[in-house]
Amino acid sequence: YKADKKKILTAMGAKQFYIWNSLNGKDFHNDLLYIQNFFISHKIVTGYNSNNYDKIMLILLLYNAKYVTPEGYHYKEKMNLTDFMFRHSQKCINFGNGYLYTLGINKSFNIPFTNYDIQKILYLDKSFTSLKQVAIILKWYRIQDLPIHYLANIDEDDIETIMDYNVNDDLITLTLKRTVKDEIDLRDDITSEFGI
């Protein structure tokens, strides 16, 4: 099953990256350079409710990349990159909308991508429709909650499980995007023409 899934993702051109640090600090995996290189050629990020979290975390990561050693140490903040990102992840979740503006990044940093938040484009944010609810409507084959508590320490054995969960959410978002493509295109045209 896992080998088949990897073949399918490869055929789709899917890219997966991760940054991880072991609790004892001896093991580290750093795809930061690959993430930076990815945004040289990929200028559009599509997500679901991505304006409120994913976009912010990506901007924070890319903005701070210049302060990170190859070993993953954020020398300006004097901590490991994973600890830095985790701290801001919690703040972003607790703060809610507008957290990005508290960081002062927008004015001094050229964001290398455009974010398309499908939830916002379809006005599903107004009805608080979650991606899980969308998956049910789409009759998705696998409705899944986060397999590991969001505050848990991540062991190396957990990485594949978390990445599989992320792929499932990405595929739901992609299916939604394809299902309502005409509506998204219409809204995009209206925005372009009337600035709405």
Regions found by a protein language model. Give the residues of each.
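Gly/Thr-rich phosphate-binding beta-strand-loop-beta motif of the actin/hexokinase/Hsp70
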Residues: Y1-G13
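Glycine-rich, histidine-containing beta strand-loop boundary motifs that form or position
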Residues: A11, Y48-S50, L146
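Conserved DEDDh/DEDDy metal-dependent 3′-5′ exonuclease domain
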Residues: F17-Q133
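Acidic, Mg2+-coordinating catalytic module of metal-dependent nucleases/exonucleases
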Residues: T46, Q119-I196
